[in-house]
């Protein structure tokens, strides 16, 4: 089961609001979600609320991020503060994953 952090639309007519949620990759946009990480208002371009500890928890579990969810969390500084030292963002197809960075010493040791 592939799990992703992505946006789920709700709100009213002509005023969409998106929840930043963790859900199965095959679920529809407004389908069942596993966890709510925050809320985003695109009209005002503000994060209404975000739970950085939940974002960090899911990122460390290896969850993929959709392009839009990654952009929103990165531009508002959430990903910068929750991603620990030694992790880097890698693009896997259309999605992003944080993985442990290999140290240069271990690479050099294998080559010698």
From Swiss-Prot:
GO cellular component: cytoplasm; small ribosomal subunit
Species per Swiss-Prot/TrEMBL record: Aquifex aeolicus (strain VF5)
Keyword Hydrolase: no
Gene3D superfamilies per the UniProt record, alphabetical: 3.30.1320.10
UniProt KW keywords: Ribonucleoprotein, Ribosomal protein
Highest taxon of the lineage: Bacteria
Pfam families registered for this protein in UniProt: Ribosomal_S16
Protein name per the record: Small ribosomal subunit protein bS16
Gene Ontology terms for molecular function: structural constituent of ribosome
Record keyword Cell division present: no
Family from the record: Belongs to the bacterial ribosomal protein bS16 family.
Any one GO BP annotation for this protein: translation
